Amino acid sequence: MNLYALSVNHRANPLGINSDEQPYFGWKLKSEKPNTMQAAYRLRIYADDTVCFDSGRVETACNAFVCGPDLLRPQTFYRWAVTVWDNHGENTTAESSFETSLSSKEWKADWMRTPRAYVQRKKGFGTQPPATLFRRAFTLSAAPRRARLYATCLGVYRLTVNGKRPDMREFAPEHTSYKGLLCFQTYDLTALLHIGENVLGMEVGDGWYCCPQTQPPIDGLQPDHTVLFQLEIENADGTHTRICSDEGVLTHESAVRASDIFDGELYDARLALPGWDMPGFTAADWLPAVKDTKQSDSVLYPQFDDPVICVKELPAQCVYTSPKGETIVDFGQVVAGRARVTVDLPTGAAVTLEHFEAVDAKGNYFNNIDSAMGITEQKDVFISDGTPQTFEARFTFHGFRYLRVSGVENPIAAQFVAVVLSTEKTNAGTFECSNADLNRLYQNTRWSQCANMLSIPTDCPQREKAGWTGDISLYAKTALLNEDVTPFLTQWLQSLCVDQRENGSIPFTVPDVSIYHYAGIQMGEQTGCGGPVCSAGWGDAAVTVPMAMYEVTGNTCILEKQYDSMKGWCDYVISRARIHAPNSTLPDEVEEHLWDTGFQFGEWLVPSLAGAPQEQLFTTMATTSAYTTPIFGWLVVHKMAQAAAVLGREEDAVRYQEEADKMKHAIRAALITADGVLRYERQGAYVLMLVFGLVPDAWVDKFGTKLAEIIHANGDRLDTGFLPTPYLLDALCIGGQRELAYTLLYQTESPSWLAQVKRGATTIWESWEMYQPDGTPKKESFNHYTYGTVDDWMFRTIGGIDQEDTGYRRLMIHPQPDKSLTWAKRSFETENGTVYVSWKREGGQFILTADIPCNTTARIILPDGTQHTVGSGHYTLNC
């Protein structure tokens, strides 16, 4: 037996965790012996080789989210060791490490701001002020033994130390709810510092904080480039040196003449200052930074998740001339990131790179990013200094597959690279089967997840780049089945807590940014609901995201951390349910527990309701919200009861379950007729009632048959919007219509998943149909992950891996393929290790192979109904 994948806060050897919060630990077991289970563990933590925490021997199989000491010392390197005993009498020990960050009480640095006069930002390319160079020189008289830098800014920054980047992170300090949460980063600079002069350099662009669409909704805010950093050095001679952002910080305009997180970046190489962040540079004409006394250290928090980095580089597939004479570069894949170009141009010559997702019907440039915010240009411009250079923007990113290029004569594909950006995450799963279209659908989901998990979970990486709560509320489970997003979602949920209102309601987007904050107020005024408003299915993220994390990984720590926030939203939902709908004829005891008032999005983007004039939007939302609102209201209260029970909050568990039961009764009374049919003959209504168990047992098959009739009447095509689609195929299976579920999965006529694949999609689209009849793309996003939730169904039903307990500790391996599929493979990295299942039809037999990790049991069900209960090990079974 051996141990691997040791982690603290779900990260390997993390640098700079919060010393004020209880850390959690994890490890995994490997053993050649079958049926291996952990019997006990002992966790020890060392500081300066002295044991500061010892759990003693703990008799449990738990090996993930194991809580450590309540408090740790700040700025301290810790070594930790875990000893594990298994059920075969063996034991082994493994070690790892972590380090705590600067505590909130230890900040001595000053906020230092650019000295230029404030420039109000306006939307549009090139309208922003230049990025700012912040330079802090200092001298060391002794060699550093240990050096840690803690840094952040208002805007986004790129750090250099003596001209070198300590890591390759992008967009630090990233996107959070700035009014109450600003992350800082921890860097190990030990190897980058030396005796003599040293220079810290921070180049700061506008980022999210200074952008008019995404700046925090704070009255009177005048956002501009501001830095805060503190360098703590332990010298080899035993002395200590501290270097802070202070009056010694000098500033200068950058060669980045304008940068906007949406519209793009303008860079003039003629204005670059080579060596500005190196010792020996003359900064005589630089201006001192100005101390900003308005900023507070109270919002500072050490970054919990991993950084945004380049996760992949894609070479251009081809360069062609469009019918309009444009130079078009095709990378073959829709991504989030930016383009890199290598050129050799005369001084003053400019290269323009316009990023876009889809060409028009004839292959010309087409800007599909047009919204209430106006047209987003997604443009980067590079002005040459006359030397050969490789250009890549620094403080922006785009959603694109294509470039329209101006200013490069006779370009070739080798000059262009697509730099794919995303938050760094560990892959957690794979899927492949005999149907190539389903494989492409799976890959499309993975690409959309990559693009929309850049600092925060977004709806799209080009038009809005916003943390729409509804998207991640629905997609969180699928995300966890694809990648380790535990640190990522933990960080985002912290912003959700900051933005949650006093009454418990949740904004449309987290972080709550200006454009959607004020849109929420406006929507409230337009609908007479007051504002800012929220919606069922969207605000639910406060409950559904932490619950998805718990259900997939067994993470009880996140339930503890988010518990008050979860209760806040549920109590808000219950308070809304108490408000009776105008002109309601329902009995008071029903209305009292039915959420059917207020602003609501409803299903959202139902195909048969798509394309309606703007003035009909609220009408179509009301049509479907009549059932989505009470159903999703019940769902979060039901899940809240489950969370309370898991944490041993018995009084809360009883209270919320009693309310959920009353809501369930009210939903049945309001939505189901005496004849056993729904008052709303829509696919989405039947889907939600079936999948959440809201249908009386005696009527389940009847509801399944009715749902099938509605689908058949629609040409065997789906007609579900945003909220019901993730549950569509499961609802059909519950209602005894598995064959129809496969029919919908394989459907190639729009609206359907494979219609997109057949149309050449490389990501998941915002709407089911993204092209006009003449082939012209719609002005919508080609990169939204939410409809990719179908992957979850494929993983379970085709791949065969499901769970019978939280955290996949007890597996159910039960492939249920239709006759057209001949083989499939699925792997998933659980908290215990890798589960791998493959099956194939060969020679009249169904042959299944399974690898079960240690600390796990599985019930394997073959297509003929044969069942096998097994422990860890390798198995081959057939029928």
Residue ranges and their predicted role:
Residues M1-R463, G470-D471, P487-T490, P507-P511, ...:
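Extracellular/oxidizing-compartment recognition motifs
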Residues K122-P129, R148, P166, E174-Y178, ...:
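Alpha-helix capping and helix-loop boundary segments enriched in small/acidic/polar residues
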Residues R148-A151, R338-E357, E392, S406, ...:
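Alpha-helical support elements that line or immediately flank enzyme active sites
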Residues V156, T226-L228, D246-E253, I412-Q443, ...:
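Active-site acid/base region of carbohydrate-active enzymes
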Residues L200, Y267-D268, E464-G467, L474, ...:
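C-terminal capping/lid segments that line or modulate ligand- or cofactor-binding pockets
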Residues D219, P223-E232, T241-W276, P302-D305, ...:
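Non-catalytic C-terminal accessory modules of carbohydrate-active enzymes
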Residues T347-K362, V420, E432, N439, ...:
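Acidic, mature catalytic/reactive cores of soluble proteins
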Residues P546, W634-V637, A641-A644:
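Non-transmembrane amphipathic alpha-helical segments
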